[in-house]
């Protein structure tokens, strides 16, 4: 079970990503535009570097909704492999059952 502070940190990161998404997108558009002057591009790079580090989507980590486990996460269910298996064995996941061939 992950510490509650780790779960809270991920929630905070998600809020920051949502808050700065438009600003980051605009700055990246300026940087990647080939017609932008070097001075404008450099200003955009500095502004992008000035944004909070946790506002980057690459710093987010998918976590199990029940335990907060960061590894073995299955996007379709929002659970780790362990909790998904437990729920499946209890019959709580419709349409999912143990493989047999």
UniProtKB/Swiss-Prot annotation:
Gene Ontology BP annotations: translation
Annotated Gene Ontology cellular component terms: cytoplasm; small ribosomal subunit
One term of GO molecular function: rRNA binding
Signal peptide stretch: none
Domain of life (superkingdom): Bacteria
Any Pfam family the entry gives: Ribosomal_S14
Keyword Ribonucleoprotein recorded: yes
Alphabetical list of InterPro entries matching this protein: Ribosomal_uS14 (IPR001209), Ribosomal_uS14_bac/plastid (IPR023036), Ribosomal_uS14_CS (IPR018271)
PROSITE patterns recorded: RIBOSOMAL_S14 (PS00527)
Matching SUPFAM superfamilies: Glucocorticoid receptor-like (DNA-binding domain) (SSF57716)
Keywords, comma-separated and alphabetical: Ribonucleoprotein, Ribosomal protein, RNA-binding, rRNA-binding
Subunit structure comment from the entry: Part of the 30S ribosomal subunit. Contacts proteins S3 and S10.
PANTHER family: 30S RIBOSOMAL PROTEIN S14, SMALL RIBOSOMAL SUBUNIT PROTEIN US14M
Family: Belongs to the universal ribosomal protein uS14 family.
Role played: Binds 16S rRNA, required for the assembly of 30S particles and may also be responsible for determining the conformation of the 16S rRNA at the A site.
Protein name: Small ribosomal subunit protein uS14
